[in-house]
From Swiss-Prot:
It catalyses: (2R,3S)-3-isopropylmalate = (2S)-2-isopropylmalate. This is 3-isopropylmalate dehydratase large subunit. One of its GO terms (molecular function) is 3-isopropylmalate dehydratase activity. SUPFAM superfamilies: Aconitase iron-sulfur domain. It comes from Vesicomyosocius okutanii subsp. Calyptogena okutanii (strain HA).
Length: 466
């Protein structure tokens, strides 16, 4: 019987099942400081041990400072942030879990360091107490976010009961327009599908446009599957995938590598596999994108206009658009290029990989950011990416243009650390969510690609690449 990639991965991990749910084995559990404290506390109260220590890998990322860390955790001024990072360290030591600590050169965002260290590879089931765990599906893995109670369950049993998802194939074919990236593909699809269009589905991204993306680009795409309502996003394994994983620290080696590769090459949807839903997109229809509202599906092309609520499809959407415009302090029919920006953020688990930094640096080379830009940040996704960028002298390009070059972390993606927007500030951000107050109370977020973030920094307004 022909199977989809999702069904192959699920079937390989099922321990027990009924019609709608299945008990599945978890191969890899990624841990950070925000969703794990209560889980570890639950284990301690129940006097439970870990089922399999080696399947866990921890890293602090949400609360870490991106400025000077020379004095370690004590340099964190916010007491809650400091306590969470200290608690993660103590719990990892107590339970014998490998932790990439804050001042380790490998430290970074959990969804960056997983693939980077080879902790993520094809065929795995991967969970983390974070909704953007779908990122890892780019490597042909079954990856999804879980809640704190489930974090405890995985620590204790390496198993989870999960509802079975339906299969959704999103196919994109054709050559991308100039300056269009995986981030633009993701935002465009979310704009067409809506933030609930993928609910209950595992999305497989396919088509020659997706095949031509780098692994970094595929990670960006799968990262944002959750913004379309799907907990799972994935791409079939190909030679790019295998070459990406090869020789990474935690990847298989020797005879295990050869056996793994043989299996990995089967991780694709079979020719006649049944999908419950299918959508087709032509790459030539996708322009650089920017969000204008308070949801990732409130998105238009950068050469477009803020939409008019009177043109909404229904009354619910009309009200939603009106509320978004009111919050964002924008007027309908405003030209996108007339929206003035205060700050720029290039980073997050969506767009902080070396490919993203190269794209932005190429646009910023020999240019300066606009005078009205109060702050422009580049925050690499990991210490390894930071080191590579510095070896390529990308940091000098950013600094010379007026950007600040920071240490790795989640940074301004969310207002949980020192990097946040002030009330009334507007940011062009390469992150993944533009909810009310996401980057700081009363702040305004416009989601963009690294290319558009860089060009907007130069223009001082939301801007296409000139």
């Amino acid at each position: 019987m022909a199977k989809t990639l999702y069904n192959k991965l699920m079937d390989a991990h099922i321990i027990r099942e009924n019609i709608s749910t299945a008990l599945i084995y978890i191969d890899r559990h990624l841990i950070h400081e925000v969703t794990s404290p209560q889980a570890f506390e639950g284990l301690s109260i129940a006097n439970r041990k870990l089922w399999r220590k080696s399947t866990n890998l921890a890293v602090p990322d949400h609360n870490v400072p991106t400025t000077n860390r020379s004095s370690g955790v004590s340099s964190i001024s916010d007491p809650i942030s400091r306590i969470q990072i200290e608690t993660l360290g103590r719990n990892c030591e107590l339970f014998g879990i490998d932790e990439i600590s804050m001042n380790d050169t490998r430290q970074g965002i959990v969804h960056i360091i997983g693939p980077e260290q080879g902790a993520t590879f094809p065929g795995m089931s991967i969970v983390c107490g974070d909704s953007h765990t779908s990122t890892h599906g780019a490597l042909g893995a079954l990856a999804f976010g879980i809640g704190t109670s489930e974090v405890e369950h995985v620590l204790a049993t390496n198993c989870l009961w999960q509802s079975k998802s339906k299969n959704f194939n999103i196919e994109v074919n054709g050559s991308l327009n100039q300056h269009v990236s995986a981030k633009d593909i993701a935002l465009y699809i979310i704009g067409q599908l809506g933030t609930a269009g993928g609910m209950g589905f595992a999305i497989e991204f396919s088509g020659n446009t997706i095949q031509n993306l780098s692994i970094e680009g595929r990670m960006t795409l799968c990262n944002m599957a959750i913004e379309a309502g799907a907990r799972i996003g994935m791409v079939a394994v190909d030679e790019k995938t295998i070459n990406y994983v090869k020789d990474r620290p935690l990847a298989p080696s020797g005879i295990k590598w050869r056996k793994a590769v043989k299996y990995w090459r089967t991780l694709h949807s079979d020719k006649n596999a049944h999908f419950d839903k299918t959508m087709h997109f032509d790459a030539k229809d996708i322009k650089p994108q920017v969000t204008w509202g308070t949801s990732p599906d409130m998105v238009v092309a950068t050469d477009g206009y803020v939409p008019n609520p009177n043109n909404a499809k229904n009354q619910t959407e009309k009200i939603s658009w009106k509320n978004a415009l009111n919050y964002m302090h924008l007027n309908a029919n405003t030209k996108i290029s007339d929206i003035k920006i205060d700050k720029i953020f290039i980073g997050s688990c969506t767009n902080s990989r070396i490919e993203d930094l190269r794209i932005a640096a190429d646009i910023l080379k020999d240019k300066k950011i606009a005078n009205n830009i109060k702050l422009a940040l580049v925050v690499p996704g990991s210490g390894i990416i930071k080191k590579q960028a510095e070896e390529e002298e990308l940091d000098k390009i950013f600094i010379n243009s007026g950007f600040e070059w920071r240490e790795a972390g989640c940074s301004m993606c969310l207002a949980m650390n020192a990097d946040k927007l002030e009330v009334g500030e507007r940011c062009a951000s390469t992150s993944n969510r533009n909810f009310e107050g996401r980057q700081g109370q009363g702040s305004f977020t416009h989601l963009v690609s690294p290319a558009i973030a860089a060009s907007s920094a130069i223009a001082g307004y939301l801007s296409e690449v000139k």
